A protein has these predicted regions:
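Short amphipathic alpha-helical "interface-anchor" segments enriched in bulky aromatics
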Residues: 79, 280-323, 359-407
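Long, low-complexity, polar/charged, intrinsically disordered or flexibly structured peripheral segments
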Residues: 324-368
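Short, positively charged, Gly/Tyr-enriched micro-motifs
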Residues: 49-120, 408-411
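Basic, short loop/linker segments at the boundary and entry of helix-turn-helix/winged-helix-like folds
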Residues: 17, 21-66, 101
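Basic, amphipathic alpha-helical segments enriched in Lys/Arg and hydrophobic/aromatic residues
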Residues: 374-456
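Polybasic low-complexity intrinsically disordered regions
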Residues: 76, 99-271
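Short gly/pro/ser/thr-enriched loop/turn and capping motifs at secondary-structure boundaries
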Residues: 273-278
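Charged, often Cys/His-bearing segments associated with DNA-binding zinc-finger transcription factors
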Residues: 1-39, 339, 429-456
Length: 456
């Protein structure tokens, strides 16, 4: 790969459509697949070894890496490309496995304990990146996407109790609650937690298509925090993750309590649940203070001297973490305009009226970053990074092609695609950069540290 020095650390637009042999060799070298291959060899035992485990594993990895739509296309390329065969230990074209060999191998790869070892490889590679790239995981975002899959024709006794593909449905509504779009699919859901700035997945889960996002998000947060080196038992909690952006699917009290306990600021869009109400009186205030809040948690004050009364949003000053409160100030004093009710509200107060809202009243409604602030709007826009990662897994590496039959094969295929994603992220971060058109390539300190970890 040829990457300019001015490109970002993870320059996803510089990925080759067809990786060369040097890139493939570096990718295979970066995979910590020793425990998985040893487990597969023990599983095979003294059975026939016509096609070694390393060769079958190499074909499974090369299929998404080389962007082949089917396994047969990858096998055809191996038969005509001697250099590619040698990278995965196949000496002659007659020794290239058949497609039915790969089908059985994928079923074994997706069963226990190999499925757990496959996921552990992903975790190890994220931990490797997290230990080298210090800002990885500071700003995160999550989302779930539907994946097409085919059901298994028959289930044998003793097989893993994996969820079979089911029908999924997602409805999109407008501001009035009317359904504007319906998306249906048959298969699974892929839940991702992604770094916003680098577009690198930190955690993933595969679930049934009808499982809610808020049910899976706690597992994603714990997995991501573990991969980033957080001490999950430390009190008070210290998390490397500063913010987490998600859509309305994660707007649940349990999720907000978990993020509060993990010291993570939620950037979660709020569901509309109030029926016939537009505002409520803030607890601890009576009608004389003129302070109310709406469903999104925005604090307002009323100028009741004017006719008709005027409602204004109070000026947000900041989050007082030690007090567990959000501080607001009189908008007239803060913004410098005259309010007819100023003399009554701010009598004897040079700074003006201040209101402190205790977050414990409702963690869901009063997050550390209020929804009516520019900071929330900018942070929430980072959620599009998950959509770009989802697009790469589907368009680049065919995770949504629907060519895999059976739950075990599907889980194995998704696990391999996620390894390709995190493996290419490792190559992008460790790749030498070119200084100018005719300049020499050089390694950054991050690339040198990452290569040392891979070689060590």
């Amino acid at each position: 790969m040829r990457i300019s020095l001015t490109k970002p650390l993870f320059a996803w637009d510089c990925l080759d459509d067809s990786p060369d042999l040097a890139t493939i060799r570096d990718f295979l070298h970066a995979l910590p697949d020793g425990p998985l291959l040893e487990s597969l060899r023990r599983c095979r035992g003294k059975g026939r070894d016509d096609y070694p485990v390393t060769a079958l594993w190499g074909v499974v990895v090369l299929t998404p890496l080389l962007r082949h739509i089917t396994v047969e296309a990858c096998l055809a390329e191996l038969r005509r490309n001697a250099g590619l065969r040698q990278l995965i230990g196949i000496e002659h074209k007659d020794l290239v496995p058949k497609k039915w060999n790969l089908s059985r191998f994928q079923a074994v790869l997706g069963s226990q304990p190999h499925r757990t070892l496959l996921a552990e490889m992903f975790n190890v590679m994220v931990q490797r990146l997290g230990g080298t790239v210090k800002d990885l995981g500071r700003r995160t975002a999550g989302d779930a996407t539907g994946l097409s899959a085919r059901p298994q024709r028959s289930t044998k006794p003793g097989q893993d109790a994996l969820d079979q593909p089911t029908g999924g449905k997602k409805e999109y509504t407008d501001d009035e609650g009317k359904v504007t779009k319906v998306v249906e699919w048959f298969g699974y859901k892929l839940h991702l937690l992604v770094d916003v700035d680098h577009e690198v997945a930190l955690a993933y889960r595969i679930t049934s298509a009808n499982r809610g996002d808020c049910e899976v998000l706690p597992e994603l947060v714990r997995q991501a925090r573990g991969n980033l080196g957080d001490d999950l038992d430390r009190q008070p909690p210290v998390s490397r993750i500063e913010t987490l952006a998600y859509d309305k699917a994660a707007d649940a009290e349990d999720v907000h309590e978990l993020l509060h306990e993990s010291d993570i600021k939620p950037l979660v869009e709020m569901r509309s649940l109030w029926k016939g109400e537009h505002e409520r009186m803030l607890p601890g205030h009576d009608g004389n203070s003129n302070v109310v809040y709406d469903e999104a948690g925005t604090i307002y004050c009323y100028d009741r001297v004017s006719d008709p009364p005027v409602r204004r949003a109070m000026s947000y000053i900041g989050h007082e973490k030690s007090r567990g409160t959000l501080k607001y100030r009189c908008p007239a004093c803060h913004q410098g305009f005259r309010c007819p009710s100023g003399q009554r509200c701010n009598a004897g107060k040079s700074y003006g009226m201040t209101v402190r809202v205790k977050r414990e009243i409702d963690l869901r409604r009063f997050p550390p970053i209020p929804r009516a602030t520019k900071t929330f709007e900018r942070g929430y826009k980072g959620r599009t990074s998950v959509e770009r990662v989802n697009a790469r897994t589907k368009i680049f590496w065919g995770i949504d092609d629907g060519n895999v039959t059976g739950a075990e094969r599907f889980h194995a295929n998704v696990g391999v695609v996620m390894l390709v994603h995190i493996g290419l992220a490792t190559l992008l971060a460790s790749c030498p950069r070119r200084d100018g058109t005719l300049g020499q390539t050089r390694l950054s300190p991050i690339a040198e540290a990452l290569r040392a970890k891979i070689d060590g």
